Swiss-Prot record:
Its EC number is 4.2.1.33. [4Fe-4S] cluster binds at residues 347, 410, 413. Binds 1 [4Fe-4S] cluster per subunit. It comes from Burkholderia ambifaria (strain MC40-6). GO terms for molecular function: 3-isopropylmalate dehydratase activity; 4 iron, 4 sulfur cluster binding; metal ion binding. Transmembrane segments: none annotated. GO terms for biological process: L-leucine biosynthetic process. InterPro entries: 3-IsopropMal_deHydase_lsu, Acnase/IPM_dHydase_lsu_aba_1/3, Acoase/IPM_deHydtase_lsu_aba, Aconitase_4Fe-4S_BS, Aconitase_4Fe-4S_dom, IPM_dehydratase_rel_enz, IPMI_cat. This is 3-isopropylmalate dehydratase large subunit. Coiled coil: none annotated. Pathway: Amino-acid biosynthesis; L-leucine biosynthesis; L-leucine from 3-methyl-2-oxobutanoate: step 2/4.
Length: 469
């Protein structure tokens, strides 16, 4: 019987299934960070339990680490406690960890793939919503809660119910100026933030296959914003080429065996999906969110929608509340919206490809950031991304234009440390969530691609990067 990619991943990891469909799944890799792991380790200590499979875990501090000068440590006592606690727990249990001043440190969903700890055919979990990122490698990856983090540490298994299968198929050549971020925002705009609820989404089609691994990770990263449990892309040569030679990846004869196995992780011809959504890439244009949910998105050449045109009273009310929070008027051209701050970073868009795309725009415009922009910051996703960008001279492109070049971490994505918006400030952000207060109490977030964020920094307002040539 033909199987989907999700079926294969599920079936190869089921240990036991109850009559009600609840299954015990084996977990191949758990990624840990400082925010959702302390209580899990404390649970092990109280119960005098060991970590079941130490080598299956990889840890890093990312949420609370400062992105400015780290020579003086962490100023906030709560943040410092969480980071120090992760250090102590990993030392005590023998878990591999990239500590704050390790060049390999970075955002957990960037360092996993970067190190080759994320591999095709794996089940991967982390106490973080955007674990779906790792599905780009043909893996089943999703976020879990702290009690589940403890359960995986203790047993290397997890209780789950199987999701339904959804295929999001994007065909055609992506227009100039459009990126993976625009693809996934367009998908969410189409199906809504509840469109994927109860599903695992496979992203397929010629447009997805043409993306780099960085682009595929961006798309899978935001599967959770469409309501899906997980997002994934089938394994192909692009996947294999990315992985070869990375630290955690098999070598020699084991590499050859692994590649042969990995290539099985694609949907069989004739496999049945519970829902299929199709998009034409030629119709995608650079996207900008206007509201307080990722589904509140439109094209850069569009206007802020008018709630009066929405027939559904519930949606109309949500639109009105969003516009009030965002201080926007219906029918305002998106290109006329001015911004106060720029954030280029996060587990969605802080890889080397993203940094290059933003730097290209800054270099092309050849001007400093606009006078109304109070802060424009670039936060690389890892120490290795930062080092690569500096070898290419990208840091100087940014600093010469008035941007701040920071140390790796989650940063303004969720208003950590001093990296936040003040009340009423408007931000062009390459992150994944534009909820009320997400980047700081009273802050207003617009989600865009790195190129769009860079252009907004220079111009002081959103612009259509397709016009830059």
């Amino acid at each position: 019987m033909a199987q989907t990619l999700y079926d294969k991943l599920w079936n190869t990891h089921v240990v036991h299934t109850e009559d009600d469909g609840t299954a015990l799944l084996y977990i191949d890799r758990q990624l840990l960070h400082e925010v959702t792991s302390p209580q899990a380790f404390e649970g092990l200590n109280v119960a005098h339990r060991p970590v079941w499979r130490i080598s299956a875990n990889l840890a890093v501090s990312d949420h609370n680490v400062p992105t400015t000068d780290r020579s003086h440590g962490i100023a906030d006592p709560v943040s410092k406690l969480q980071v120090d606690t992760l250090d102590a727990n990993c030392d005590a249990f023998g878990i591999t960890q990239f500590k704050m001043n390790d060049v390999r440190q970075g955002i957990v969903h960037i360092i996993g793939p970067e190190q080759g700890a994320t591999l095709p055919g794996m089940t991967i979990v982390c106490g973080d919503s955007h674990t779906s990122t790792h599905g780009a490698f043909g893996a089943l990856a999703h976020g879990i809660g702290t009690s589940e983090v403890e359960h995986v540490l203790a047993t290397q298994t997890l209780l789950q119910k199987k999701s339904k299968n959804m295929l999001v198929k994007v065909e055609g050549a992506l227009p100039r100026g459009c990126t993976a971020k625009d693809i996934v925002l367009a998908i969410i705009g189409r199906i809504g933030t509840a469109g994927g609820t109860g599903y695992a989404i496979e992203f397929g089609g010629s447009t997805i296959r043409a993306l780099t691994m960085e682009g595929r990770m961006t798309v899978c990263n935001m599967a959770i914003e469409a309501g899906a449990r997980a997002g994934m892309v089938a394994v192909d040569d692009t996947t294999i080429d990315y992985l070869k030679g990375r630290p955690f990846v098999p070598t020699g004869a084991e590499w050859d065996q692994a590649v042969e196995y990995w290539r099985e992780f694609k949907s069989d011809e004739g496999a049945q999906f519970d829902r299929v959504v199709e998009l034409n890439a030629a119709e995608i244009v650079p996207q900008v969110t206007w509201g307080t949910s990722p589904e509140m998105v439109t094209s850069i050449d569009g206007r802020v929608p008018d709630p009066e045109r929405e027939k559904d009273p519930v949606k109309r009310d949500a639109m009105e509340r969003a516009l009030a929070y965002m201080a926007l008027e219906p029918n305002t051209p998106m290109e006329s919206i001015k911004v106060d701050k720029i954030f280029i970073g996060s587990c969605t868009n802080a890889r080397i490809e993203d940094i290059r795309a933003a730097a290209y725009v800054v270099k092309k415009l050849n001007r400093r950031i606009a006078s109304n922009v109070r802060l424009a910051m670039v936060v690389p996703g890892s120490g290795l991304v930062k080092a690569q960008a500096e070898r290419e001279g990208l840091d100087k492109v940014f600093t010469d234009a008035g941007f701040e070049w920071r140390e790796p971490g989650c940063s303004m994505c969720l208003a950590m440390n001093a990296d936040r918006l003040d009340p009423g400030e408007r931000c062009a952000s390459t992150s994944n969530r534009n909820f009320e207060g997400r980047q700081g109490a009273g802050g207003r977030t617009h989600l865009v691609s790195p190129a769009m964020a860079a252009a907004a920094a220079i111009e002081g307002h959103f612009v259509d990067i397709r016009q830059l040539g």
